[in-house]
């Protein structure tokens, strides 16, 4: 059987190999054949199929796939259960948009049952596209039996976990101020509020309001507290003002800048400069006239904040009176003088700090009541003022809540040329009433809903919470045991998040999601948390026995079915389910348990696959899935949910901008894979930058990967296949002992073992970029550009002997090992490479590289000394090539010698051992060694002021002058070792090469290059003999090109005829006739006066006429 020599198209390899995988069930076998082996557990973070996949999903799934494939090849059994995240706000908002309804229409225009059915259908809308991408990119995950979060079994496991929280008294109900999204109609958790991009810079109207003091003998009648707010819409709900007890405040006599009325105002002394010009300090109050540009002011008195506590003031906007006394100054521990006035306006219904300090001080909230006696604030859950706020009743408090049509209608209603927001009109109202001291636009960062992109409100809600604060310290400690990649994300972003943890708001006032399994009596005195379907059946039976009318259908655990189930309390009271759903992030965080329907089934399976050895998702999941996994596992089971995690960075466009359909810079993953192939796409994404860094995705980068890495690897394989087929090499012979192989064989095999170690270590440390780059460097620099190039003649010259067999075996081993090492990153191409080799040699008893074992280091093949000297040969050759390029002297032109300054005997011996190799590689006649470079280089030296300055600051100038005067031999001494620099006062300063900057200038006739401690001087003088030899090498090159153009086989012998040119060329051809014939497989070379049927070939500035005949 022959090795495959067909040209390989990367774009087609994926389809070909995928068909092979399907036909042979390779993925299934990769799991089944490891049965009984140690397990490696991977958790798939469930995507939602209600949106299409993007190029960033290719990145994320490649990272996941790499380590699952690697661990499988290491012998672990790696089950990869796929999953779908099917509940929550994203689905509901999409359905509302498609149906043209809002949340308020559900239950009116459409039943809850119909609505949820639409959600169930919508959530799998793009499943086929996700499945297609999964297959195309080679992501191995079980799509046949995925977990789906809307299925009853999954929900039942979630209920079990919630009951665990409830029994541990970690689940409670509280009436608190929570982030609330009017656009979505539900409260949000703190981790939802901290998703990337939720805080946006906005330009709002801010106002410094004047709160008039009630009659007080210590103050004038026109005295006001100044309090600043960026949310003027909350001012109708003001019921207190907060000061810092130890902050210094001042009473200032001045004039209102809008009404010009005389006022006395109180504010923090430290913030005077924000409102008063220093130039106006000495102006006369009596001389002030309305409209004067500078408003005079005078400080009358100062107070500590604690002296102001208890002072009462008039209600600023008296739309609704509280039932108990309010409107007085209280102390607040959060008050500062960083901005504002040092006095904080307190609206307990719209701020957590406000509610806390108001409660401590006995200050009531400004609330009204509905028909059932339930209290609610002056803004409804759609974000509109209630009827009590008569001037603005029914108006949205945030401009962003209005559509363009609604805004235009409101403008017309206002009778204005331009729409003015509620904040703007409240500010105008205050100005006119002498109740505003300063109104301006203010840019600040404000939280927005992660799904609607609309501003949130801080709103009083009855919500269920998981008491994460009770386990905060333990969650912090457990996090320290997790291997985060990068570490900074675990310590910083995630660690800081845990350090500042607040209780988890679990409640969602929506319809499509996992219902909260808590039933409560109407008075709230009794409740039951249901943890299983069986338990629910038992409780329904109890309710029926107690004579309570209840639904009994529990085929579907969603709303509205569970809403109709009424249970009975222990004391006989009816209990209805709390109507909330739970946070969708709890759904995904429950997947380690719910994917197996634990604890109702698969207990052993769960125990063997918990916690996860590895997970990976985008960095945005730090406060999403990563957190919920960690919180549930840590709080309930005192364990981490995952041991190793990669937090992927963003995939940006090539200019570093976020991809956006609106901008038009989105890269289509399907088109990319179809055009470039999945392997090149994956390899580019992994090797371009570590996965946790942001990737500037550039299609040109994939093209470069195709050319440089896959092109080089394929050419190397094609070279091997061509000659192996000619010689019928099938690896049937016994392995040639290492000691009997050439030094270059032993070197590349040693480098291969070093590569195996480096790649295995990189994969094991979750460093795929290091692994990919190491493989790439080996293939391009060591295997192709060095080993194959230097050993070409062994493959196509001479008889099929032991040396040739060794060359074939060595190159085969390298190719096969590279296929195994690269398989996790480039699964299609590496499987084809492996199969193309193995179908001939039959060396491996498996049909796919993904069923093979990962290579292990063979210590016997490692030779550090050999690797070192070959590395020296490569580095020296590279320096000489760089000089040739700079001097425009081609490699085919021989040169006489190089000089290498060497001070260490071991280093000299190592270079001498590879002298012949260097000479052949860079086309020179001799390598000579010198102990310094003074004969070929002029050196200059100057101090490294940055380094020396840290140690000898005071003496730096003197040291600098002394260094500048050093001689050539002194500079050489510094390069060799530590040099003692003596100053005028006798002080001795040790100087190393790090303390100075040494620069070189070439001497005519020589050219010098240095890199990494190696210096090479090249003699660039050309003698006639060297010129002639260069001409001969050029002729060999042109003959080889003609052979190729004629389609001659490697073994074909030829006759060469060349028309004479000038004396130099004729002499060169005659003197080097034997060399030319040997190199070109020619049995003769003839020079003739005239060649009528020859072919013209260009050679430098000459034209040669030559003919070759078979």
Curated annotation (Swiss-Prot):
This is Isoleucine--tRNA ligase. The keyword Cell cycle does not apply. It catalyses: tRNA(Ile) + L-isoleucine + ATP = L-isoleucyl-tRNA(Ile) + AMP + diphosphate. It is an enzyme of class 6 (ligase). InterPro entries: aa-tRNA-synth_Ia, Anticodon_Ile_ABEc, Ile-tRNA-ligase, Ile-tRNA-ligase_type2, M/V/L/I-tRNA-synth_anticd-bd, Rossmann-like_a/b/a_fold, tRNAsynth_Ia_anticodon-bd, Val/Leu/Ile-tRNA-synth_edit. GO terms for biological process: isoleucyl-tRNA aminoacylation. A motif ('KMSKS' region) lies at residues 658-662. CDD domains: Anticodon_Ia_Ile_ABEc, IleRS_core. A motif ('HIGH' region) lies at residues 47-57. One of its GO terms (molecular function) is aminoacyl-tRNA deacylase activity. Catalyzes the attachment of isoleucine to tRNA(Ile). As IleRS can inadvertently accommodate and process structurally similar amino acids such as valine, to avoid such errors it has two additional distinct tRNA(Ile)-dependent editing activities. One activity is designated as 'pretransfer' editing and involves the hydrolysis of activated Val-AMP. The other activity is designated 'posttransfer' editing and involves deacylation of mischarged Val-tRNA(Ile). It comes from the Bacteria. Its main location: cytoplasm. GO terms for cellular component: cytoplasm. Pfam families: Anticodon_1, DUF5915, tRNA-synt_1. It is found in: Cytoplasm. PANTHER family: ISOLEUCINE--TRNA LIGASE, CYTOPLASMIC (PTHR42780:SF1), SOLEUCYL-TRNA SYNTHETASE (PTHR42780). Its EC number is 6.1.1.5. Belongs to the class-I aminoacyl-tRNA synthetase family. IleS type 2 subfamily. Its cofactor is Zn(2+). Monomer. IleRS has two distinct active sites: one for aminoacylation and one for editing. The misactivated valine is translocated from the active site to the editing site, which sterically excludes the correctly activated isoleucine. The single editing site contains two valyl binding pockets, one specific for each substrate (Val-AMP or Val-tRNA(Ile)). The gene is ileS. The keyword DNA repair does not apply. Keywords: Aminoacyl-tRNA synthetase, ATP-binding, Cytoplasm, Ligase, Metal-binding, Nucleotide-binding, Protein biosynthesis, Zinc.
């Amino acid at each position: 059987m022959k090795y495959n020599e067909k040209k390989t198209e990367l774009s087609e390899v994926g389809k070909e190999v995928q068909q092979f995988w399907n036909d042979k069930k390779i993925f299934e076998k990769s799991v089944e054949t490891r049965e009984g082996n140690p397990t490696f557990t991977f958790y798939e973070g469930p995507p939602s199929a209600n949106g299409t996949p993007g190029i960033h999903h290719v990145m994320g799934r490649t990272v996941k796939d790499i380590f699952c494939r690697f661990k499988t090849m290491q012998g672990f059994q790696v089950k990869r259960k796929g999953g779908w995240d099917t509940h929550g706000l994203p689905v509901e908002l999409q359905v509302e948009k498609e149906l043209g309804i809002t949340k308020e229409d559900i239950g009116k225009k459409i039943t809850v049952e119909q609505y949820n059915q639409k959600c169930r259908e919508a959530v799998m809308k793009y499943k086929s596209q996700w499945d297609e991408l999964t297959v195309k990119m080679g992501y191995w995950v079980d799509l046949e039996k995925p977990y789906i979060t809307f299925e009853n079994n999954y929900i039942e496991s979630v209920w079990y976990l919630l009951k665990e929280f409830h029994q541990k008294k970690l689940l409670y109900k509280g009436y608190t101020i929570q982030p609330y999204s009017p656009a979505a109609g539900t409260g949000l958790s703190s981790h939802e509020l901290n998703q990337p991009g939720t805080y946006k810079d906005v330009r709002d109207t801010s106002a410094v309001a004047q709160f008039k003091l009630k009659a007080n003998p210590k103050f004038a009648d026109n005295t006001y507290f100044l309090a600043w707010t960026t949310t003027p819409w909350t001012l109708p709900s003001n019921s207190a003002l907060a000061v810092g007890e130890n902050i210094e405040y001042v009473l200032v006599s001045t004039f209102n800048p809008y009404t010009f009325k005389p006022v006395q105002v109180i504010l923090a002394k430290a913030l005077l400069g924000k409102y008063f010009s220093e130039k106006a300090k000495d102006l006369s109050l009596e001389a002030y006239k309305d409209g004067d540009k500078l408003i005079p002011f005078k400080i009358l008195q100062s107070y500590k904040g604690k002296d102001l506590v208890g002072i009462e003031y008039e209600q600023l906007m008296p739309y609704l009176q509280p039932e108990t006394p309010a409107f007085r100054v209280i102390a607040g521990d959060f008050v500062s003088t960083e901005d504002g006035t040092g006095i904080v306006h307190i609206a307990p219904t719209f701020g957590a700090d406000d509610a806390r300090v108001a409660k401590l001080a006995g200050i009531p909230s400004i609330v009204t009541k509905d028909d059932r006696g339930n209290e609610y604030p002056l803004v409804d859950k759609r974000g509109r003022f209630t009827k009590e706020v008569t001037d603005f009743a029914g108006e949205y408090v945030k401009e962003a809540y209005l559509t363009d049509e609604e805004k235009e209608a409101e403008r017309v209603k206002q009778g204005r040329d331009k729409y003015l927001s509620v904040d703007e009109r409240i500010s105008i109202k205050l100005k006119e009433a002498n109740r505003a001291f300063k109104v301006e636009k203010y840019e600040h960062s404000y939280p927005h809903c992660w799904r609607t992109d609309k501003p949130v409100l801080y709103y009083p809600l009855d919500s269920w919470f998981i008491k994460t604060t009770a386990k905060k310290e333990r969650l912090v400690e457990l996090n320290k045991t997790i291997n985060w990649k990068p570490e900074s994300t675990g310590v910083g972003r995630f660690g800081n998040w845990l350090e500042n943890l607040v209780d988890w708001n679990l409640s969602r006032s929506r319809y499509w999601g996992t219902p909260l399994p808590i039933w409560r009596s109407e008075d709230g005195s009794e409740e039951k948390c249901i943890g299983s379907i069986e338990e629910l059946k038992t409780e329904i039976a109890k309710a029926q026995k107690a004579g309570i009318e209840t639904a009994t259908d529990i085929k579907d655990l969603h709303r509205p079915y569970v809403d109709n189930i009424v249970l009975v309390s222990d004391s006989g009271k009816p209990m209805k389910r709390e109507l909330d759903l739970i946070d969708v992030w709890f759904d995904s965080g429950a997947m380690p348990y719910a994917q197996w329907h634990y604890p109702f089934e698969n207990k052993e399976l769960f125990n063997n696959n918990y916690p996860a050895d590895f997970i990976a998702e985008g960095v945005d999941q730090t406060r999403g899935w990563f957190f919920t996994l960690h919180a549930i596992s840590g709080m309930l089971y005192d364990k981490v949910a995952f041991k190793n995690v990669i937090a992927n960075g963003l995939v940006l466009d090539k200019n570093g901008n976020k991809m956006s359909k609106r901008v038009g810079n989105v890269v289509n993953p399907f088109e990319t894979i179809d055009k470039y192939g999945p392997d090149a796409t994956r390899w580019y994404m992994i090797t371009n930058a570590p996965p946790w860094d942001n990737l500037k995705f550039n299609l040109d980068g994939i093209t470069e990967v195709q050319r440089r890495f896959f092109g080089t690897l394929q050419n190397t394989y094609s070279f091997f296949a061509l000659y192996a087929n000619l010689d019928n090499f099938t690896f049937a012979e016994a392995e040639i002992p290492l000691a009997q192989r050439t030094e270059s064989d032993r070197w590349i095999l040693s480098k291969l073992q070093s590569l195996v170690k480096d790649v295995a270590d990189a994969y094991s440390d979750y460093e795929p970029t290091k692994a990919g780059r190491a493989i790439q460097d080996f293939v391009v620099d060591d295997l192709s550009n060095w080993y194959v190039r230097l050993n070409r003649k062994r493959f196509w010259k001479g008889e099929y002997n032991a040396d040739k067999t060794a060359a074939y075996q060595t190159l085969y081993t390298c190719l096969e090992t590279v296929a195994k090492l690269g398989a996790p990153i480039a699964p299609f191409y590496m499987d084809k490479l492996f199969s193309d080799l193995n179908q001939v040699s039959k060396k491996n008893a498996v049909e796919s590289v993904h069923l093979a074992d990962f290579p292990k280091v063979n210590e016997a093949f490692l030779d550090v000394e050999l690797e070192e000297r070959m590395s020296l040969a490569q580095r020296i050759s590279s320096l000489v090539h760089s000089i040739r390029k700079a001097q425009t002297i081609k490699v085919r032109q021989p040169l006489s010698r190089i000089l290498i300054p060497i001070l260490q005997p071991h280093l000299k011996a190592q270079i001498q051992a590879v002298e012949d190799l260097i000479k052949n590689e860079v086309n020179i006649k001799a390598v000579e060694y010198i102990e310094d470079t003074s004969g070929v280089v002029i050196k200059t030296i100057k101090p490294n002021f940055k380094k020396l300055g840290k140690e000898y600051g005071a003496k730096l100038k003197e040291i600098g002058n002394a260094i500048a005067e050093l001689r050539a031999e002194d500079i050489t001494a510094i390069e060799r070792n530590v040099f003692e620099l003596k100053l005028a006062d006798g002080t001795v300063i040790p100087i190393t090469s790090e303390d100075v900057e040494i620069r070189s200038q070439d001497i005519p006739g020589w050219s010098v290059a240095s890199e990494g401690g190696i210096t090479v001087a090249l003699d660039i003088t050309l003698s006639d003999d060297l010129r002639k030899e260069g001409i001969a090498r050029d002729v060999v090159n042109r003959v080889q090109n003609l052979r190729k153009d004629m389609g001659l086989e490697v073994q074909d012998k030829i006759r060469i005829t060349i028309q004479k040119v000038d004396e130099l060329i004729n002499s060169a051809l005659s003197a080097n006739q034997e060399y030319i014939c040997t190199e070109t497989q020619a049995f003769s070379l003839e020079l003739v006066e005239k060649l009528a049927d020859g072919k013209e070939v260009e050679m430098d500035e000459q034209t040669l006429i030559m003919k070759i005949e078979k």
